[in-house]
Regions:
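Beta-strand-dominated extracellular/periplasmic modules and repeats
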Residues: 1-86
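Extracellular beta-sheet/turn segments enriched in Thr/Pro/Gly and aliphatic residues
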Residues: 86-107
């Protein structure tokens, strides 16, 4: 079985109020191959909690020899990121910071 990685985050406006709406993770690759078995990539979509937080399971982008990424769409903006496997999980802020250093509203 292909491992999954949990991605968590919290989105808030500059005023500190939580962002409301949906978060969508769209993989650039529909399938990955591991040990000669083809697996569908997870493409989760979830509603932000009242405090602007979310948690989803995704297919890590480093489990296949072909390079691919996720597009993460939120009411606060969108990002294209790699999601390496990490049993402890990943944060949206960490994924965004890895590709776009600097201050961001996501946590």
């Amino acid at each position: 079985m292909i491992p999954t990685t949990t991605v968590t985050g919290r989105l808030q406006h500059r005023s500190g109020l939580p962002v409301q709406g949906m978060v969508r993770f769209t993989p650039s690759r529909l399938w990955v191959v591991r040990d000669n078995i083809t697996w569908a990539c997870l493409a989760p979509e979830t509603r932000l909690a009242a405090d602007g937080s979310f948690s989803v399971q995704v297919t890590p982008t480093d489990t296949d020899p072909i390079w691919w990424r996720y597009m993460i769409e939120t009411p606060a903006g969108w990002w294209e990121v790699s999601v390496p496997h990490n049993a402890a999980g990943q944060t949206l802020r960490g994924l965004i910071g890895e590709h776009h250093p600097g201050s961001r509203a996501a946590q």
